[in-house]
Structures are given as C-alpha cells and as structure tokens.
C-alpha cells in the first residue's frame, strides 16, 4: 500500500508574479485575491489540495515589499515567519521580467532556510520557449534550487507536472483536512477578500492600498439563500466617492461582480448589501487591523 503524503508549502515572490493565480488554479476555487495591483494578499491563506495519495496545504504569503505602515510591517513578518513553518517553499517569478531587487532580497532570505526551495518561472506563455533556460540559469547564479519548473498558472501549462514534483518531496503524513475543504479561513474572510478583489479591479490607482473590507453580518436565510452585509473601508472622503461612483453605479457593479463569485463559493443564492465608510489612517491602527482579520491573535 502506498504511503499517504502531506505537507505545508509556502508560495513566495514579488507582488503580482501569479502566486494567487497558481493557488486558485490548483484548488479550482477563488481563495486568494487576484489583482494586477501590488500588495493584494494581506494574510496567510491556507489552500488545501486533497488527492487520493496526498494532501498539500498551500500558504499564500503577502508580497515582499518595503513596509510603509503597521499593516505593511505585519505583512512582511507573516511572509518571513511562514518560511520557517513549512515543508517546502515555492519561489515564483515572472518569465517576462528581469531579476529585480525584490527577487534578490527574497533569494537572500531563502539561502538561510533548510527546506526544499523550488524556482517556478511563471507566465511562460508570454515568452519564447528559447528564453526559458537562460532565465532559469540567471536565477541559479544567485542560489541553488531543489528544482526549477517553468509554467503558466493562468493557462494551466505544466501545473499538473509541478504538483507531482511537489508531492514527491512531501513527507509521509495524515490527511489534516477532510475531503472537500479547500481553505482553513472562515467563509466570512474569503467573502471579504472576494469583495476587495472587485474593488481593486474597478477603482483607480488612488484606492487599492487604502481598501479594507469587513463582513458585518452573514446569515443563512434558507437552504439556498444567504444574506451578507459588508462594509468597505477607505481612508479619505474623496476615496469614498470614487468607490461609490456617480449615482452609486460603481458600488453597484462591485456588488454585482462580487455576488457572482460568492454564490459560486457558497453554492447558494446571495443577497449582498454593501456600505462604504471612511476610517482615517486605518492601516496604522493595530486594533482596527485586527478587527478586520488581517492580524492573527498571537501569544
């Protein structure tokens, strides 16, 4: 009988290299927020992939960046601490971007850990196949990797192969989560992330890092209907106007798009009621950040 394998795998990389896209591709559900704007993942999100012979729990870390406020400090602390708690690390980079300072900073961190580190060259659909090997070699000049794997998370290219590679490095262990469970975050947190994703997609550059979403109330009204009330927090009055839009059109579109994803997640019809409030300088208020679910209670 084949031994069952299980392990925890961290996904790390500069902002927007496709970490969340990869995890959502593997899980088949939207768990990690996806956006083309930097610093969109604010919390460790555990995505659970269960197969007959293995279970891999993915940890999607905040994008590496230089902190500018207390929330940023916390995001960096989460990313660094995660590396010491896992069985393997995926260092993901973009095939169509040269090595930057952020990549070099991450590799300096990774040199000191003892767990297997996989270099994943993502977005290979954007470059010529002849470019892939030189890209891998350029990273290998900086540090040794357990294996280097080119892929396109968005297109699904080489993803299954990489999962098989990962499984071969996982230790023997039990199934930590039951079949069908794809995240260890409460549903309210995932719902708030889906709403925040739509705000990021539909608002201008002024808004993204100032956005926080809190699910105030989530009630199952019947077997196939859920009522959700949520508040979108911004830091300035001008931002509130941008999120709401002329005649409330922008907020209505945010709600419409979020509702579709939430219904797919919950498998129920959803009534979604959204509010927009100003909470000045909220990213520097530790208690408020904790209330929003971005800081875990620590001993």
Curated annotation (Swiss-Prot):
Protein name (Swiss-Prot/TrEMBL): GTPase Era
- Tell me yes or no: is Metal-binding among this UniProt entry's keywords: no
**Complex formation:** Monomer.
The UniProt record gives the binding positions of GTP as 13-20, 60-64, 122-125
Which residues does the annotated region (G3) include? 60-63
Is rRNA-binding one of the keywords UniProt gives this record?
A: yes
The coding gene here is era
Question: G2: where is this region?
Answer: 39-43
Provide the transmembrane region boundaries.
Answer: none
Instruction: Spell out the residue ranges making up region: G1.
Output: 13-20
Era-type G domain residues are: 5-172
Q: What family is this protein classified in?
A: Belongs to the TRAFAC class TrmE-Era-EngA-EngB-Septin-like GTPase superfamily. Era GTPase family.
């Amino acid at each position: 009988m084949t031994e069952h394998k299980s392990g925890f795998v961290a996904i790390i990389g500069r902002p927007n290299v496709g970490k969340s896209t990869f995890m959502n591709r593997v899980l088949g559900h939207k768990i990690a927020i996806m956006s083309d704007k930097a610093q969109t993942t604010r919390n460790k999100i555990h995505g659970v992939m269960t197969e007959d012979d293995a279970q891999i729990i993915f940890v999607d870390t905040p994008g590496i960046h230089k902190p500018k406020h207390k929330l940023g400090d916390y995001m960096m602390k989460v990313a660094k601490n995660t590396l010491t708690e896992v069985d393997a690390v995926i260092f993901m980079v973009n095939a169509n971007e040269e090595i930057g300072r952020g990549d070099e900073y991450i590799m300096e961190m990774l040199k000191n850990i003892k767990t297997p580190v996989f270099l994943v060259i993502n977005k290979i659909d954007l470059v010529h196949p002849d470019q892939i090997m030189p890209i891998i070699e350029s990273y290998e000049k900086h540090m040794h990797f357990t294996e280097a794997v080119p892929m396109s998370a968005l297109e699904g290219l080489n993803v299954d192969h990489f999962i098989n590679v990962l499984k071969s490095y996982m230790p023997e262990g039990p199934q930590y989560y039951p079949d069908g469970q794809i995240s260890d975050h409460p549903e309210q947190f995932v719902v708030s992330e889906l709403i925040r994703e739509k705000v990021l997609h539909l608002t201008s550059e002024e808004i993204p890092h100032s956005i926080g979403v809190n699910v105030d109330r989530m009630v199952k009204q019947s077997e196939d209907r859920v009522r959700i009330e949520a508040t979108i927090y911004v830091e300035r009055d001008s931002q509130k106007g941008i999120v709401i839009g002329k005649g409330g059109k922008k907020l209505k579109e945010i709600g419409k798009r979020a509702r579709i994803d939430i219904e797919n997640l919950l498998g129920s019809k959803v009534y979604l009621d959204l509010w927009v409030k100003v909470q000045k300088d909220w990213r520097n208020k530790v208690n408020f950040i904790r209330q929003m679910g971005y800081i875990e209670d620590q001993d």
